[in-house]
């Protein structure tokens, strides 16, 4: 059975492949059930494995020559559920054009199944500047 730390390492490697146009390794880490969801970094959401799988293929196809750095803000597991809260910083090509760094706030929710951990939800959105509540 894959430990949570091993799974997080696999996810890091899979995301590196993802930002180079290959969704396959990341998709292998997902549950393939009707209850999986993704709130994608380009907006919108998908529910159910067929829709999530399509979205992951579409998103990965937009990337190339990329690198992702992951800064973990927190993670934990209890029983058959686990989560991670990260800042993902990506550089590379999007739609064939070079871009600067993009930072995303990302939460993964995972469930233990089939002898290891599987992603059941990803929420990603752009990390914007912090607004001062006093102003």
Show which residues each predicted segment covers:
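A beta-strand edge to alpha-helix "cap/lid" segment located at domain peripheries
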Residues: 1-28, 35-135
């Amino acid at each position: 059975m894959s430990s949570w730390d091993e799974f997080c390492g696999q996810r890091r490697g899979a995301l590196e492949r993802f930002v180079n146009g290959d969704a396959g390794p990341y998709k292998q880490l997902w549950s393939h059930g009707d209850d999986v969801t993704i709130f994608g970094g380009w907006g919108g959401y998908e529910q159910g494995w067929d829709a999530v799988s399509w979205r992951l293929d579409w998103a990965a196809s937009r990337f190339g020559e990329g690198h992702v750095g992951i800064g973990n803000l927190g993670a934990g597991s209890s029983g058959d559920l686990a989560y991670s809260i990260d800042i993902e910083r990506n550089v590379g090509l999007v739609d064939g054009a070079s871009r600067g760094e993009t930072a995303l706030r990302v939460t993964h929710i995972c469930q233990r199944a089939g002898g290891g951990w599987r992603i059941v939800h990803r929420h990603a959105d752009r990390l914007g500047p912090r607004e001062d509540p006093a102003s």
